[in-house]
Swiss-Prot record:
Disulfide bonds: none
Family, similarity comment: Belongs to the bacterial ribosomal protein bS20 family.
Stated role: Binds directly to 16S ribosomal RNA.
A single cellular component GO annotation: small ribosomal subunit
Keyword Chaperone in record: no
Biological source species: Haemophilus influenzae (strain 86-028NP)
Protein name in UniProt: Small ribosomal subunit protein bS20
Molecular-function annotations in GO: small ribosomal subunit rRNA binding; structural constituent of ribosome
Keywords, alphabetical: Ribonucleoprotein, Ribosomal protein, RNA-binding, rRNA-binding
NCBIfam families: S20
SUPFAM superfamilies per record: Ribosomal protein S20
One record GO biological process: translation
């Protein structure tokens, strides 16, 4: 139920809700990939962490290019995790 009376405003409300749900799903998926890398780092498994990191990079970069997150936020995630993986030895 929307408060809108104008047809175009009703349509925009529907589209906005649809987009909000899609974005929430994408954001959740991205966070899951990031958590997978953190889990591998915490376990001390360097090779598994590196492969999870490669997958995470693809997802984070895609979300940044689509505007779901800022490019700097994507860069921060990648550099922080890369440094932790490098530390594993």
């Amino acid at each position: 139920m929307t408060l809108a009376n104008i047809k175009s405003a009703k349509k925009r409300a529907v589209q906005s809700e649809k987009r909000r749900q899609h974005n929430a799903s994408q954001r959740s998926m991205m966070r899951t990939y990031i958590k997978k890398v953190y889990a591998q780092v915490a376990a001390g498994e360097k090779s598994a962490a590196e492969s999870a990191f490669v997958e995470m990079q693809k997802v984070v970069d895609r979300m940044a290019s689509k505007g779901l997150i800022h490019a700097n936020k994507a860069a921060n995630h990648k550099s922080k995790l890369a440094a932790q993986i490098k530390k594993l030895a």
